[in-house]
């Protein structure tokens, strides 16, 4: 199988979307690929595993590894168990009720440094890149859409800056109430992307303090936690006026005609890390062969998802639509997973990189991606005081375990399962990234210099305490 070429995938996207929406339930009858590249029988120390997940499109590698037989090829009998929210999922892994899980990219990092429940967690595999969007209610859309720059086709020009919300923020403030948005968890990429987008548009999302775990100190807008599947209903009820979430819950708002996605996260930070495979360090050390087998199976699933110019995506849509996985309508899942993204009825745009599972080294747990998560924790006060660059780098490398990923991936290369060029030759730090919506360049080797570039956020020398934010 060839790794997905994004241009060819884009060309095929319309046909894939139509096929998925038409209900191609029968297109997934092919047998799991067998090539002799498996974990030797009896090698795994713990063959029966329970993995947790949240009902989101990006749990796809877990579902595909099970449904296409990749777990079984590696000697694993895996039960996939949906969790009510990210806190329940995290507690399940820490408490041992779950062996591993589909986790937010920031969860293992936050637990390791003691944000919330302290635990020694690791991420030996990145599950995907991109996959989120920010949606607003029809009420907010009606207020901002007339003022948006339009293209020759009459559709809004993208990306849309958060600055368009400034008049809305002021209107709510004049009425004595805050503009409220939802996000999925305090240490989620969704939270940090939403905050980044707001701050880039001149809107302060607030600081976290020991007495303000909601992170609203100094905020122009109020952010609160809502579990992903509950986002559309919470928006429809008027409890929130917008949210940052993964799919299919932005597309669900479009289908229900209750909201409009303003921006996809690849327009905030291209190829950003989204979910990881999370587990305790103790699990990986106690069951090393099992951990390797688990990573191998998921890499195979990631390759399947991005292979042959996206040809497998319609089948993946049908699998994810099942009630034991995401449980959303297939056409809603397909609206973001097959090379295009629906912003509004009649506004469907090419989005070949909305979900990346295997291409662009999506599985490799880059330390620089973990450092970025840490910088945002510091920027908004979850990390109370300055830390040296070395602390950021050492923490990132201790949690994002590229060594475990490489052991599994290089074996798959040697066996001819994945191409050698799909595994990066790297020290774990990407080159300086310049594609952020605000144009600020990010060098993962220099986190403090990066933090100093922002107009909104904690400054060098500032710290947070119960009494508030100290001056720099």
Label each PLM-derived region with a short phrase.
Residues 1-18:
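N-terminal secretory signal peptides and thylakoid transit peptides that target proteins
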Residues 19, 150-189, 193, 293-339:
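Ligand-binding clefts/hinges and TM-proximal coupling segments of bilobed small-molecule sensing domains
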Residues 27-35:
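Bacterial lipoprotein signal-peptidase II cleavage site
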Residues 36-224, 236-237, 241-254, 258-271:
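Short, glycine-/small- and polar/acidic-enriched structural segments
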Residues 134-135, 276-279, 283-284:
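Short glycine- and hydrophobic/aromatic-rich loop-to-beta-strand nucleating segment
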Residues 286-403:
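Secondary-structure end/capping motifs
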Residues 371-472:
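Conserved C-terminal helix/tail region of periplasmic/extracytoplasmic solute-binding proteins
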């Amino acid at each position: 199988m060839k790794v997905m070429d994004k241009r060819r995938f884009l060309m095929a996207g319309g046909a894939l979307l139509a096929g998925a929406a038409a209900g191609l339930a029968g297109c997934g009858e092919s047998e799991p690929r067998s090539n002799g590249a498996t974990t030797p029988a009896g090698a795994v120390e713990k063959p029966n595993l329970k993995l947790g997940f949240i009902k989101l499109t990006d749990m796809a590698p877990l579902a595909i590894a099970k449904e296409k037989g990749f777990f079984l090829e590696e000697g694993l009998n895996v039960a996939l168990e949906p969790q009510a929210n990210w806190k329940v999922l995290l507690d399940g892994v820490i408490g041992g009720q779950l062996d591993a899980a589909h986790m937010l990219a920031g969860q293992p990092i936050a637990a390791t440094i003691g944000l919330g429940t302290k635990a020694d967690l690791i991420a030996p595999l990145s599950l995907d890149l991109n996959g989120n969007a920010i949606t607003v209610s029809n009420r907010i859309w009606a207020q901002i859409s007339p003022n948006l720059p339009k293209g020759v086709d009459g559709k809004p020009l993208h990306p849309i800056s958060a600055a368009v919300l400034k008049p809305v923020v002021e209107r709510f403030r004049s009425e004595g109430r805050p503009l409220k948005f939802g996000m999925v968890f305090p240490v989620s990429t969704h939270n940090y992307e939403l905050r980044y987008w707001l701050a880039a548009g001149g809107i302060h999302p607030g600081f976290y303090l020991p007495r303000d775990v909601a992170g609203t100190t100094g905020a122009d807008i109020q952010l609160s936690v809502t579990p992903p599947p509950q986002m559309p209903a919470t928006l429809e009820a008027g409890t929130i006026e917008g949210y940052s979430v993964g799919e299919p819950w932005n597309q669900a708002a479009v289908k229900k005609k209750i909201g409009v996605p303003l921006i996809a996260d690849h327009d905030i930070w291209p190829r950003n890390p989204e979910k990881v495979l999370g587990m305790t360090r103790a699990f990986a050390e106690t069951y090393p062969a099992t951990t390797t087998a688990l990573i191998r199976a998921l890499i195979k699933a990631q390759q399947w998802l991005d292979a042959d110019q996206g040809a497998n995506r319609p089948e993946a849509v049908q699998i994810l639509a099942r009630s034991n996985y995401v449980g959303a309508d297939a056409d809603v899942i397909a609206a973001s997973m097959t090379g295009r993204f629906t912003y509004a009825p009649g506004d469907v745009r090419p989005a070949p990189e909305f979900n990346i599972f295997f291409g662009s080294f999506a599985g490799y747990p880059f330390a620089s991606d973990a450092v970025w998560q840490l910088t945002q924790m510091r920027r908004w006060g979850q990390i109370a005081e300055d830390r040296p660059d070395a602390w950021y780098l050492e923490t990132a490398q201790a949690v994002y375990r590229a060594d475990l990923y490489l052991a599994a991936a290089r074996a798959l290369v040697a066996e001819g399962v994945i191409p050698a060029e799909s595994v990066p030759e790297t020290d774990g730090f990407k080159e300086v990234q310049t594609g952020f919506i605000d144009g600020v360049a990010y060098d993962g080797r220099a986190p403090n210099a990066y933090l100093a570039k922002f107009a909104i956020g904690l400054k060098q020398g500032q710290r947070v305490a119960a009494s508030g934010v100290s001056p720099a």
